[in-house]
Amino acid sequence: MAKSPENSTLEEILGQYQRSLREHASRSIHQLTCALKEGDVTIGEDAPNLSFSTSVGNEDARTAWPELQQSHAVNQLKDLLRQQADKESEVSPSRRRKMSPLRSLEHEETNMPTMHDLVHTINDQSQYIHHLEAEVKFCKEELSGMKNKIQVVVLENEGLQQQLKSQRQEETLREQTLLDASGNMHNSWITTGEDSGVGETSKRPFSHDNADFGKAASAGEQLELEKLKLTYEEKCEIEESQLKFLRNDLAEYQRTCEDLKEQLKHKEFLLAANTCNRVGGLCLKCAQHEAVLSQTHTNVHMQTIERLVKERDDLMSALVSVRSSLADTQQREASAYEQVKQVLQISEEANFEKTKALIQCDQLRKELERQAERLEKELASQQEKRAIEKDMMKKEITKEREYMGSKMLILSQNIAQLEAQVEKVTKEKISAINQLEEIQSQLASREMDVTKVCGEMRYQLNKTNMEKDEAEKEHREFRAKTNRDLEIKDQEIEKLRIELDESKQHLEQEQQKAALAREECLRLTELLGESEHQLHLTRQEKDSIQQSFSKEAKAQALQAQQREQELTQKIQQMEAQHDKTENEQYLLLTSQNTFLTKLKEECCTLAKKLEQISQKTRSEIAQLSQEKRYTYDKLGKLQRRNEELEEQCVQHGRVHETMKQRLRQLDKHSQATAQQLVQLLSKQNQLLLERQSLSEEVDRLRTQLPSMPQSDC
């Protein structure tokens, strides 16, 4: 009765310790599952709620499972006690009738084998217990190592996911800048049909990448990106409105230029009409004077040409102002791009702070583990104290045994019954040994299973590490290649822009020259018509007045011929220049067309490359997600296996405790039987001595008997 409260307290302490360990393990496993589920790209917003509910259900099941185990163990102990009571109740009723109530109680207490038979079993039992404790420690150490490795793998996966997110953000920003630049170029120089085709081909992968990125990113990062997108769209709208305003200004300037050209043509037509009217109404002397001084009329044309040059300079200054405004808009776009970069840097700093917080959490976990170790040490010290108290109780019990040994002298007649009971106990011992051997074989098979599982996990961890290193190398190489290609393409685009600007200026100059040449041709034709008219008049006058003006007519004819030759030479020169300008314009147009085709082909190739890169990244992400799911399933299996092993360890511990109690009872009964045997032997010796003394007295009396009748006689 003195040992029952101590055993109950020990069982309670062990149960509390096991519960604390299980709670700690369940928390760590829950944290691992949460960390694995955070980097998943394909999971939506409803999935975390489901995972949370399942984790809560698992925690409830885990907390309820030890209670079920304890109730099952209690039921097993009750069944064992009932079986023992049934076995003891199978004793023959005839013997029970012969035995007194005191003898029956003492018989139940002494129903155990001798000390010599139980020494071997006790030694084997202690060795077996030590072996099981060592195996349990080894399993716990391996489990802790596996947990640490899994934490390392989880941290590495988080780092890879952050790198992928940053790369996607950079790629989206670059694509946006390229699309904006290409849109401006197409709006200014390329036709609307080609612009629409290229725009559609360039926008499709961009929208597709945005969709993939939105699916992959987490909720917080999506909100930040949406804010950035809103700000960027607002800035784009402002810049587009400015561009529209500038385009409207350009259209107005072009209209004014066309109006001025029409006014010039009208004025030139009026001037030509005035000159024709004047020539028709002149007399001979005035006509001669104007023919001699025909160069005076060219001054008017030179003035008009100078005025047109001034207007051209004004238009060029207006174009320069428009270009400066375009440069300002480009600077604004660059400032907006820098602001977006700053926002991304801020987000990266936030992620860095997040990692710091995770490191602090890990440090707190380590401190909690240290505290748990300290509490375990305190438990060990308390257990040692209780062991000392148990030894004291054992000493007191031995004293009580000695006191009760004096009462066991009455059992000298039950030696035969004790021998029969010893035989029964030996049979039970043999059955217990067989059970222990079966348990040992089961434990050996389970050890083999555990070693196999550990080997598989190590192989899988090595494989995952190798694959991770290869993925990191490929990722770095791909990133360097893409950066180089983008820099080269940016340089080429800048060169092409400069060449386009130069060709545009050259085209404008050539167009202006061609317009001037055409105007000069028209003027020369008008002058030729006038000269022919004058020649016709002079010929008519020549017939009437040949004698008076023959000399003057010859001089005028010579002057006219010289003038005609000069005009023909000028016309030929202008036609040659015009042909040259047309050829140059044709070459420029062909070069521009080839350049535009090359640009289109490069854009198509870049779009294809971007699609290939996106497909590769998606396939890599899918592979990583599959590997993560496989590791997650493997973790679940290992957790189940661990729980089963813990349950088996608990059951084995309870069985060992029952066996220890049984062995203690056997020790008590063996010591009591040994004392009884010693007492019986001493009593037998006393009886033998008394028998010898009685036999001696009988012999002495027999010797005395024959002498008694002689004396009577």
Curated annotation (Swiss-Prot):
GO cellular component: cell-cell junction; centriolar satellite; centriole; centrosome; ciliary basal body; cilium; cytosol; nucleoplasm
A Pfam family hit: CCCAP
Basic and acidic residues bias locations: 201-212
Stretches for region Mediates interaction with OFD1: 533-713
Subcellular location: Cytoplasm, Cytoskeleton, Microtubule organizing center, Centrosome, Centriole; Cytoplasm, Cytoskeleton, Microtubule organizing center, Centrosome; Cytoplasm, Cytoskeleton, Cilium basal body; Cell junction
Signal sequence bounds: none
Coiled coil, from the record: 129-175, 223-273, 348-707
UniProt KW keywords: Bardet-Biedl syndrome, Cell junction, Cell projection, Ciliopathy, Cilium biogenesis/degradation, Coiled coil, Cytoplasm, Cytoskeleton, Leber congenital amaurosis, Nephronophthisis, Obesity, Phosphoprotein, Senior-Loken syndrome
Domain of life (superkingdom): Eukaryota
Function as written in the Swiss-Prot or TrEMBL entry: Plays a role in the establishment of cell polarity and epithelial lumen formation. Also plays an essential role in ciliogenesis and subsequent Hedgehog signaling pathway that requires the presence of intact primary cilia for pathway activation. Mechanistically, interacts with and mediates RABEP2 centrosomal localization which is critical for ciliogenesis.
Subunit structure: Homodimer. Interacts with OFD1; the interaction is direct. Interacts with FAM161A. Interacts with RABEP2, ERC1 and CEP131.
Stated name of the protein: Serologically defined colon cancer antigen 8
Taxonomic lineage: Eukaryota, Metazoa, Chordata, Craniata, Vertebrata
Gene from which the chain derives: SDCCAG8
